[in-house]
Amino acid sequence: MSTKTVPYTAYKVKDIELAEYGRREIELAEAEMPGLMALRKEYGASKPLKGARIAGCLHMTIQTAVLIETLVELGANVTWSSCNIFSTQDHAAAAIAAAGIPVYAWKGLTEEEFNWCIEQTLFFGEDRKPLNMILDDGGDLTNMVLDEYPELAEGIKGLSEETTTGVHRLYERMKKGTLPMPAINVNDSVTKSKFDNKYGCRESAVDAIRRATDVMLAGKRVVVCGYGDVGKGTAQSFKGAGSIVTVTEIDPICALQAAMDGFEVKQLETVLPKADIVITTTGNKDIVRPEHFEAMKDKTIVANIGHFDNEIAVSWLNEKHGDSKVEIKPQVDKYTINGKDIILLAEGRLVNLGCATGHPSFVMSNSFTNQTLAQIELWKNTDEYKNEVYMLPKHLDEKVAKLHLERIGVELTELKQDQAEYIGVTVEGPYKPEYYRY
């Protein structure tokens, strides 16, 4: 068991001179992130996160910079790393570093650098005080703490997790009895999963393919592997661009949804020979396997918008066909398999952040408002929670949504008292039971 700290490094970014450029974009994003700005106004004076030392591991983007500065405004000390080797926007990282917040992130990390950056966030300041809160995306920070620095777990009041993959890891730990602190599953808040995962991907999936390849998407045959919330948004993204979209699914309910939404649902092997683009969205492993690559036609584009790169057999590609690899431009690589060229984007990692700038600010405000509320709840009310995985209560989910309505001109109809009594709710909400599926 480790008892060491790590040497103090104030920050490490690609180029601190990019800070002014980053600051201008952060200010622009703030106007599109009304939820976070409302929390600053509501809680800025009371500082509910005072004393919290939050280590964050989440894509270091412009939108994340607004989240970080919101946590600081609410009283927290924050350190930050990125949860993906390609997702950092270097001007965003520079702006945060220039603001005096320790950040360790740059685009194009090696795996060794990736782990080093996460490790730097575990201890705060020159006196090396350990973290006491975790804000994670994918579970890499949580795993490092629990597997390599388990002695730190006792001092951690709680953690919040952003994405499907990380939530799966938390539930596995809970089942095994190895989760030593309470956790809030932010991913499955309605205002996260039905907005970030669906509407975010609906905008960013096509954006990434266009920026990376400049291909015409209208008329192209696109295979979307998976029809969960991410798959739904991704399929709609390509459909809106005029692509001919086919979905693959293991779940009969999701498969039926895809069919009723107007998509063909087929097995991957059936549609691969004619596919122009294949994109994985499942959060599972081994979706595009060696035999699938061998069945693809010349110039097929392959990408992933799930959290990790193991949805696609990237290791096999590099082991068996690495000698044919040609970098067309950063995060766009060509492999030759049986005389056919295959185009792999972002090395099989998150394509919307590797090849573009991720989701728009407005939809990320939904997710990050959830994250902020989760951190406040765990920090202030730790004793009310067991070492289990929890959801944010529905009244907070509704609050997140309400904070974003004015920005897009939404007018809510007000429920009358007798109407509220008729359906068994209060005038103020929550308006739906816990079992309601949006």
UniProtKB/Swiss-Prot annotation:
Binding site for substrate: 61, 137, 162, 192, 196
CC per GO annotation: cytosol
GO molecular function: adenosylhomocysteinase activity
Cofactor note: Binds 1 NAD(+) per subunit.
Domain of life: Bacteria
Entry's EC annotation: 3.13.2.1
One Pfam family cited in the UniProt record for this chain: AdoHcyase
SMART domains linked to this entry: AdoHcyase (SM00996), AdoHcyase_NAD (SM00997)
Protein residues bound to NAD(+): 163-165, 197, 226-231, 249, 284, 305-307, 352
Principal EC category: hydrolase
GO biological process: L-homocysteine biosynthetic process; one-carbon metabolic process; S-adenosylmethionine cycle
Keyword annotations of the record: Cytoplasm, Hydrolase, NAD, One-carbon metabolism
Listed pathway(s): Amino-acid biosynthesis; L-homocysteine biosynthesis; L-homocysteine from S-adenosyl-L-homocysteine: step 1/1
Catalytic activity line of the entry: S-adenosyl-L-homocysteine + H2O = L-homocysteine + adenosine
Cofactor: NAD(+)
Subcellular location: Cytoplasm
Protein function: May play a key role in the regulation of the intracellular concentration of adenosylhomocysteine.
Family that this chain belongs to: Belongs to the adenosylhomocysteinase family.
Protein's recorded name: Adenosylhomocysteinase
Gene this protein is translated from: ahcY
